[in-house]
Amino acid sequence: MSTAGVAAQDIRVPLKTGFLHNGQALGNMKSCWGSHSEFENNFLNIDPITMAYNLNSPAQEHLTTVGCAARSAPGSGHFFAECGPSPRSSLPPLVISPSESSGQREEDQVMCGFKKLSVNGVCTSTPPLTPIKSCPSPFPCAALCDRGSRPLPPLPISEDLCVDEADSEVELLTTSSDTDLLLEDSAPSDFKYDAPGRRSFRGCGQINYAYFDSPTVSVADLSCASDQNRVVPDPNPPPPQSHRRLRRSHSGPAGSFNKPAIRISSCTHRASPSSDEDKPEVPPRVPIPPRPAKPDYRRWSAEVTSNTYSDEDRPPKVPPREPLSRSNSRTPSPKSLPSYLNGVMPPTQSFAPDPKYVSSKALQRQSSEGSANKVPCILPIIENGKKVSSTHYYLLPERPPYLDKYEKYFKEAEETNPSTQIQPLPAACGMASATEKLASRMKIDMGSHGKRKHLSYVVSP
């Protein structure tokens, strides 16, 4: 079945005498629609003339005939008015005679592939993500729907044309290496029958090889290599899932972190947000400053300002020891004693109770208690009948009893020699006064020599 027959059945416009055998139908079909330019822009945007692929000379003759008929076709729709409407069942499919050449059979096979594609895709003349070159208006079926003869069925108008334009922009940015990487495992496939419309191609796994830098060449593409003026789009669109995944890897806040898994070194790598040069460089870490010195929490006093306590880490400084000086010693030598006037030290006070400071009652109490015998007694040191020192003496806790015998002997001597007054040995007792002590000492010094020897022998230890 030719392209004109497919279009007549899909658009559901009755054609009575518009079809001619041997491929002459397209010329008369132009007269059924008023404006042939709109039809060429909308329906022939799939480039059916180019899709004939120039297989053989009979096909070329048909194409030239179609071109002449298109030029000579009238611009008005009076031919359609003369023909009149007819039911859709009276439209038999156009069958080409078996006398056609083998090239015409291949053309029919190719056109059968367009049969299912043109059912839902008449308004969408191009598969998704293909560059539109010959369609000037974004809504191609608007001119066809303006006809008042018989309204065409409502075809799904694309709401995401802007999305397709954005997809084409993304496609321009992510061509060659990335697309080849994502689609390198897919094999070239022939026309898919029972293919749904453009919207339903999502998830079908179809691939459009027209976007490749080095597309896979098929037998039909080799045959149409002579026509360099037209671009032959392959009706199989690329899988949108791969482009979605590609879009996600190049957009969003995490786009700079998602890199392709494998990079092809032979292909030139385009500058993209996933390149390593665009990554923000982490500045070097600033070294941590040393901890400040511990503040002084003590009270503000003389200790804080002193040099001794200025540094807490070190112990307080101890002044060096000076050599011991004899003058500061606690036990000085006799040579360092101070010299008194005339070289004589004043007499030492005795420990006996002095009657000047002790009351008579205290003395009576001591005598009544029998403490008179325990009064300390002071004996001077006498050598050779002379008192040796006025500062040193013997301190006895009490009067010794043998002094009474000596005192009795002194009395007998005095009686025998009355001219010599010999006093008994003075014993500075608690009851003797200071004047009596001095008088007794003077008397002892004036005593005889023999007695002094005796006294010195007795008293000195």
Swiss-Prot record:
The modification N-acetylserine is found at residue 2. Negative regulator of EGFR signaling in skin morphogenesis. Acts as a negative regulator for several EGFR family members, including ERBB2, ERBB3 and ERBB4. Inhibits EGFR catalytic activity by interfering with its dimerization. Inhibits autophosphorylation of EGFR, ERBB2 and ERBB4. Important for normal keratinocyte proliferation and differentiation. Plays a role in modulating the response to steroid hormones in the uterus. Required for normal response to progesterone in the uterus and for fertility. Mediates epithelial estrogen responses in the uterus by regulating ESR1 levels and activation. Detected in lung, in airway epithelial cells and alveolar type 2 cells (at protein level). Detected in uterus stroma, luminal epithelium and glandular epithelium. It comes from Mus musculus (Mouse). Residues 283-292 have a biased composition (Pro residues). GO terms for cellular component: cytoplasm; cytosol; nucleus; plasma membrane. The gene is Errfi1. The modification Phosphothreonine is found at residues 126, 130. Belongs to the MIG6 family. This is ERBB receptor feedback inhibitor 1.
